[in-house]
Amino acid sequence: MAQEVENNNNDHLVQSSDPEHPANLIPELCRKFYNWGWVTGTGGGTSIRRGDHIFIAPSGVQKELIQPHNIFVLEFPTPKYPPSDRKYIRKPLELKPSACTPLFLTAFERGAGCCIHTHSQWAVLVTLLVEREKGPDACFEISNIEQIKGIPRGKGKGMLGFFDTLKIPIIENTAFEEDLTGSLEKAMDQYPDTYAVLVRRHGIYVWGDDVAKAKTQCESLDYLFQLAVEMHKLGLPWVK
């Protein structure tokens, strides 16, 4: 497989005039996220599953400059570990695969169609506030805010309501991105209805059934995190 990829890099997988094709959507999303301050300094990542293919933004490339020909493509399903067993069917030879890959795969194994990883400052700040106010094992909670309606209750359960309490688990950061995978899987098991996991002092992983849902859920969460930080400054409780 490695020799085949080297000789025939399957460029047709990322060549499409369709703006909704993953190879076109990922660069567009990364530019938006960069402009919103979510993926500065090459940080963060985005991945989309379409059928039995997974499209992933590369590592170490400025997110606002990513082009379709920079995109990696994996067969799905594919092993998470070891990295050498992952079934790449398109691998730009001059670039490195995303360190987020096993975490994206974890979301796709649970039925996600898109997974987004950001380094949002608001996400980082709420992880620190939760740790200081409630301890290292607590999750982020907020209620009685209209934007909560933008977050699902769980698979097939509709959306949260104004009076519901949104809960987002928080895991501890690690020295290497891939080492977060076990903690992410554990958080998903403990909170089976969640569509996001915060990483303390790092950022957040958000996934959805498709690209639009993952993006809008990520936007709603970032709004709520920013609001929570401002509420904390004013001494206002997050849960009423």
From Swiss-Prot:
It is found in: Cytoplasm. Binds 1 zinc ion per subunit. It catalyses: 5-(methylsulfanyl)-D-ribulose 1-phosphate = 5-methylsulfanyl-2,3-dioxopentyl phosphate + H2O. Residues 1-20 are annotated as: Disordered. Residues 1-17 have a biased composition (Polar residues). Coiled coil: none annotated. Zn(2+) binds at H117, H119, H202. One of its GO terms (molecular function) is zinc ion binding. Its main location: cytoplasm. GO terms for biological process: L-methionine salvage from methylthioadenosine. SUPFAM superfamilies: AraD/HMP-PK domain-like (SSF53639). Belongs to the aldolase class II family. MtnB subfamily. This is Methylthioribulose-1-phosphate dehydratase. The lineage of its organism: Eukaryota, Fungi, Dikarya, Ascomycota, Pezizomycotina.
